[in-house]
């Protein structure tokens, strides 16, 4: 696959992002340490969701393929995807005891902390049928993240998506995350 081919596919602005949507909270006001605040601001998180937001902001058409927890935080992420225009028809609610990824992120310059909770992360329950039902051929480019390879069944499902992408000559971009 040549660089020119990759660039031509990227320029078509039609992306499938495979990874996670999460929830990020920030101590408020900005610059406040977590242990010194009593107020937080909540935002959409997760590298794949965030890439989708930015690509959409600049004219891209993005679909996110992931799973989120079937609770208030998972539904918050879905609402945020809608707000930013990231297509979520491939996002499934996970009804087991999994949870959405959750991060507390400080905006301090010194002694910065990011605290990330990913116990039984919903996005890692992505499975082969999710990939089979995603119609990979409808996308010009696929973006994956390193964390989607961290545990089963997501790992083998994403590797299956890579095999299909190769067969269909769809370029894949990986964010180490």
Where are these regions (language model features)?
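Short, basic, glycine/proline-bearing loop/turn elements
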Residues: 37-38, 116-118, 145-147, 175-177
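Conserved N-terminal subdomain of the carbohydrate kinase-like
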Residues: 61-144
């Amino acid at each position: 696959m040549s660089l020119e081919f990759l660039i031509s596919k990227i320029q078509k602005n039609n992306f499938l992002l495979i990874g996670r949507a999460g929830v990020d909270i920030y101590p408020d006001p900005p610059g406040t340490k977590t242990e010194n605040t009593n107020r937080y601001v909540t935002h959409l998180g997760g590298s794949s969701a965030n890439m989708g937001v930015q690509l959409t902001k600049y004219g891209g058409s993005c679909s996110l393929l992931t799973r989120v927890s079937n609770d208030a935080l998972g539904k918050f992420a879905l609402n945020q995807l809608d707000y930013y225009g990231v297509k979520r028809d491939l996002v499934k609610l996970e009804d087991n005891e999994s949870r959405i990824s959750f991060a507390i992120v400080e905006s301090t310059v010194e002694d910065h902390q990011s605290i990330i909770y990913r116990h039984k992360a919903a996005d890692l329950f992505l499975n082969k049928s999710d990939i089979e039902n995603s119609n990979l051929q409808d996308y010009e480019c696929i973006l994956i993240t390193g964390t989607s390879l961290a545990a089963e069944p997501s790992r083998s499902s994403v590797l299956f998506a890579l095999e299909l992408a190769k067969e269909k000559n769809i370029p894949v971009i990986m964010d180490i995350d």
